[in-house]
């Protein structure tokens, strides 16, 4: 884990809990949060975690094994989520708004943590999340303050279209979700996405959302 905690008077009270995508490491999400805060005059506080499985020979890490089923994937995410929530149960973080943010596998992990710990997080930013197997999840009775921001590229073929549709419908049922889609973007991140996250967080006064699309 890499961390940066700003404690100066007037510092942003948000704490970002961040999870990278498959084959990457904790630096991926640090680059993302640095881009989100660039030019805002403020510095983010964050915990950026590295995946629990190292990728042999090629470097990088991931959060659950290749080819695992839905229940195993959920168990792996639950183990990470329980450990992280235990870590957050510290006076150091007591006054912080806690925001999950993850890309791909890390986006799915962020979603599972928000669902399994409904009172812990103020928001969850899900960047191109994997969503395989979540069709039976029903968030219509989701009693939580957590807001969701779901983001996909229109040309993302890494996450099947059916899984993207599942993500939109599952999150729409919570009544606390927003969705953005980026024309021509594959399984990646672009400038508009960074800008939309910035606006979702209230880091800019601009209230327009050029990438916004209906959730369902």
Task: Set out the residue ranges of the language-model regions.
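Conserved alpha/beta-hydrolase "nucleophile elbow" surrounding the catalytic nucleophile
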Residues: 20-22, 101-103, 153
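Alpha/beta-hydrolase fold nucleophile elbow
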Residues: 93-103
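C-terminal catalytic histidine-bearing segment of alpha/beta-hydrolase fold enzymes
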Residues: 162-216
